[in-house]
Structures are given as C-alpha cells and as structure tokens.
Amino acid sequence: MGFRLFVVIIIGCFVLIDIGCTPPIQTLEIYNNGKPKFAREYKVISSGLGPDSITVKLIQYYRNGMQHYQQEIMNKQANGKYFSWHPTGVKSAKGRYLNGELSDKWTWWGKDGLPDSIRTFRKGMLHGEYIDYFVNGKPHKLMEYVENKKYGYYKELDEKGRKVSVGEYRNDIPHGHWIWWQNRIKTRELTYENGLKNGPFKIYDKLGKKKILGQYKNDKKDGEWNWFSNQKGLDSLIVYDNNQYNGEYKIWHANGNPAVTGYYNNGLKNDKWKWFNKKGQKDSIKIYDTGQLFGLATIYYDGRQPRKIMTYVNNKLHGKMTSFYRDGTTESEITFANGLRSGSYKFLDSEGNNEEEGAYLKGNLHGLVLRWYTTEQLSSTAMFSSGKLQGLMRVFSPSGSTMKEGYFFDGLPVAIFEYYENGRFRRILSYRGNEIIQEKVWAETGAEITTPALGIRTKSNVHSNGNPRYECTYKNNSKHGIEWNWGEYFDLQSLNIYDQGLLVLKRTWSAPGVPNEDILFPGRSKQVIIGPYSSAG
C-alpha cells in the first residue's frame, strides 16, 4: 500500500463556476484537452475574489475527467475528510486530516474495489488499528500501533483465512507468547520478554507432534531441552545453562535404545561418556576433562570384550594402546607420546605369535624393526632413523636362509646383496643415490655371469694353492665397484665397495658365514657402524 496526498493552493487569475446553491468551484489548472486538473471549492467572506474568499476543499481530476481526490481545507491546511478514487471511479482511499496531519482511521482499496489496507493515525503517527489485506480482499496482517510503534496484539493469516502466527508487540519489539502455524498445523511456540526469548520454546513436526521442547532465559538456551522423533519418542536430551551445554546429555537410537550418554560443564564435555550400538551394548567409553580427552578410553566389540584400550592426555594419545582379537588375545601394542607413535610397538597373530616388532620416535619408525612369518621364523630385519632406512636391512626365507641384505643411508640404497637359498651370491648392486653404478651376477652354481661393462677393468691375484686371494674392479685407475679378499681356502674375509675411489661400504667376517663388522662410509662424518647384531651407531 502506498499513498501520496497533495494540498495545493494557487493564487492568480481564477475562473469562477457558479452553480447556483452549490458551493462555488474555481478551476485552478486544466489539462491540454480542456478538462480541469485542479480545482477548489471556496467560501466567499464578503464580496469579490482573492482575499475575499477562502478555500474549503481541494479537488484533483484525472485526464479523463474523473475525480482523483477531494480534500477538505481549513485554516489553509488539510483539515477534515479526504476521499480518492481510481481512474475508473472505484474508490481508492478514505480518511481525514487534522491540522495538516493524518488522523483517525484511513482505508485504502484496490482497483477492483477490494480492501487493500487500513491504518489508524493520531497527529500523523500510526496509532491504533493496522490491517493489510491480500489481493482477494481477505485480511493478511492485523496489529496495533501506539505512536508509530507496534504495540499490542499481532495476527497473520494466509489467503484462506487460516492463522499463520499470533503474538504481541511492545514498543515495536516482540513480547509475550507467540505461536506459528502452517496449513492449520502448529509448528512453533515461543515466549518473548521485551524482544528477548524468555520462557518455553516448542517446535512441532508436519503432523503437529512435538519435535523440540526447551526454554530460553534472557535470549539464551537454558535448562533441559528434549528432541523427539516419530519412531522412538524421545530422541535426545541436553541441559543448557546460559546458552551452553551444562549437565546431562543423552541421545537415543531409533529403536529407543540409548546411543550416547555424557555430561557437559560450561559447554565442554566432562567426566565419563558412553556410546552404545543399536542393541544397547557398549560401543566405547571415554573420559573428558574440560572438553579434552583425558584418561582411559575403551572401544568394545559387543559391549563386553574390549577391542582397543588406550589413554589420552590433553586430547592426545599418550602411553600404550592395546588392540585385541575377539577372543581377548592381544593383537597389537603401540606406544604413544603427545599424540604421536613414540616408543616400542608390536603386532601378533591370533595364535599369539609375533608378526612385527619395533619402535617409533615422534611418529616415525626409529631403530630396529623385526618381522616374522606366521611361524616364529624371522622374515626381515631393518634399521630406521626418523622414518628412513638407515644401516642394514635383511630378508630371510621361511627356512631361515638370508636371501637379501641391503645397506641404506638416509633412506637411499648404498649396496644390495642377493643370495640363493644355498648361501651363494646371486647378485650385488652398488648405488650412488638411486643410480646403480655396478652390478655383479652369479649362477646358483657360483659361476659369475656378469655382462662386461665398458671402462671397467679388474685386478686380481691368487694364493699359492691357486685359490683366489684378491680381486678389485677399477675405473680410470680408481677403485670402482667391489673389492674382495679371501682366505687360503676361499673363505671370504672382507668385501669393500668403492665409488670412483671413495670407500662407501666395508664388510668383514670373523669366520666363514659369520659377519664381524660392517661400516658405511668409514672414516667420514656420516660413518655408520653395523655390528653382527645389526645395531647401527
């Protein structure tokens, strides 16, 4: 609804229309088609025109000659009744002015003659009844104003006349009990106090059944709140204090069994919390302190047998975490510190046999890592430093034979030794970073079948009995590749690997097949000493 009112007083050369006993009318302005645009009714004080007459009504016309509005005038300002019409002659507004200001009840109509709105004024301000209508002429919003502010009842209806909301205002802000509907079904109830939510709060589903019950205090959630579902009734329960979770907390599964129970303190999880599966069996138990996991936590298979037991400190795993098979036997033990794997760990099969054992440091593998086959036979050993292979890595066959030995530094290979089941060499690879700089290959019988490489020459000598004593490959007069030393009876005593004259690996044996000491980058700042028990320095 919009309205615009004009009060026009024009002084000049007037055209008088004398219609006998009717009030005299004076045309003030005409359209270019000769029809009047503005006119006035006046009252003659003595005789003559101008100062001898006063305007008592202003009239405006449409171009088609139909009246637009009439406004009564007193004391040279709008005073009295006001009427207006649409160009078709259908009334559009009715009201009155007092001393130039809107006053009392005003009504507006649409072009079809149906009501559009009603307003009530006092001294130009909204004061009293206020109504908006739909285009079908039915009320839409009904309320009251006091001195331009909503004050009192409020009602909103849909186009079919059904309630949408009911409440009240005080000083232009919501106050008191409010209710909302949709298609005649109540959807929400809320109580206000001077614009703040204060008191019971209810939400209903599409069937009108309760969905949420709670309350507010000073615009903040307070006390017990309940959530409901059609299938199971009470769905969850939470206690608030000053808009924060504070107290008991419960959630239920669709079948009515509990899903979660716990406690809040000032909005933070506290004390023991429990989770349950749909059968009502315990799923997990955790302890909280001021919102952080702190203490023992247990995860279950079926409410009785633990699946995992662990400890938290300041919301981070700390100490030993143990996992179990369904029969209760240990599956793994892992040590944590400040949320990271740090310390010893091991994995076992369902029969209690070791599968893997080692240690972590700040989340990375560090130290010796052992792995087993399903039996008690080792499958591999490896040394790590801060998550990278460092030192010796060995791989064994199920029968216990060494099948592979790898020497690593900072995660990169230095040399790889591969063996046949009978213990003889199968292949030796020398590396510079990830690049292979030499490869030696043997048949299972012990015969070398290496493909000759360009630029590589070999120096060697033998014992007096004809057995090999020494052999080394060179590149550009520098030792490059493998250097061998054998005893008189072909027992390997040492093996060195060079990279263009630089010694990168030194291996020695105290007896045939018995390693003594291995050294990576001997004599250099990054030297790594590997003893017969595969311990790196």
Question: Which sequence ranges carry the predicted segments?
Answer:
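Bacterial N-terminal signal peptides that target proteins for export
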Residues: 1-7
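Bacterial N-terminal signal peptides
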Residues: 7-18
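Glycine/tyrosine- and acidic-biased, solvent-exposed loop/turn segments at the edges of beta-strands
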Residues: 18-537
